[in-house]
């Protein structure tokens, strides 16, 4: 690596809205504020909701089901 051409690599803190604080490395040099992290994201916490599309599929079949029949 060449000397004096690379940005300075610093440790910064990333603070989530849930209160979780993570220390990460960055060349930006500013502390970050996150909206969501691994501690509060629904996918990682297991509180993910399943979207029910059954009603949409039935509505589609009712509207266009007769077109496929000969």
Swiss-Prot record:
Keyword Signal: no
GO molecular function: metal ion binding; rRNA binding; structural constituent of ribosome
Cofactors: Zn(2+)
GO biological-process terms attached to the record: translation
Gene3D superfamilies found in the cross-reference section: Ribosomal protein L31
Alphabetic keyword roster: Metal-binding, Ribonucleoprotein, Ribosomal protein, RNA-binding, rRNA-binding, Zinc
Coiled-coil stretches noted in the UniProt entry, renumbered to this chain: none
SUPFAM superfamilies tied to this protein: L28p-like
Matching InterPro entries: Ribosomal_bL28/bL31-like_sf (IPR034704), Ribosomal_bL31 (IPR002150), Ribosomal_bL31_A (IPR027491), Ribosomal_bL31_sf (IPR042105)
Residues noted as binding Zn(2+) in the record, renumbered to the chain: 16, 18, 37, 40
Cofactor mode of binding and number, as noted: Binds 1 zinc ion per subunit.
Similarity field: Belongs to the bacterial ribosomal protein bL31 family. Type A subfamily.
NCBIfam families, A to Z: L31, PRK00019.1, PRK00528.1
Assembly and oligomerization: Part of the 50S ribosomal subunit.
PANTHER family: 50S RIBOSOMAL PROTEIN L31, CHLOROPLASTIC (PTHR33280), LARGE RIBOSOMAL SUBUNIT PROTEIN BL31A (PTHR33280:SF6)
Annotated protein name in UniProt: Large ribosomal subunit protein bL31
Native source species: Psychromonas ingrahamii (strain DSM 17664 / CCUG 51855 / 37)
Lineage: Bacteria, Pseudomonadati, Pseudomonadota, Gammaproteobacteria, Alteromonadales
């Amino acid at each position: 690596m060449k000397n004096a051409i690379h940005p300075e690599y610093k440790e910064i803190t990333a603070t989530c809205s849930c209160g979780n604080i993570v220390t990460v490395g960055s060349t930006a040099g500013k502390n970050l504020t996150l909206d969501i992290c691994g501690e509060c994201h629904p996918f990682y916490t297991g509180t993910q909701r399943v979207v029910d599309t059954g009603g949409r599929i039935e509505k589609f079949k009712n509207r266009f089901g007769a077109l496929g029949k000969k």
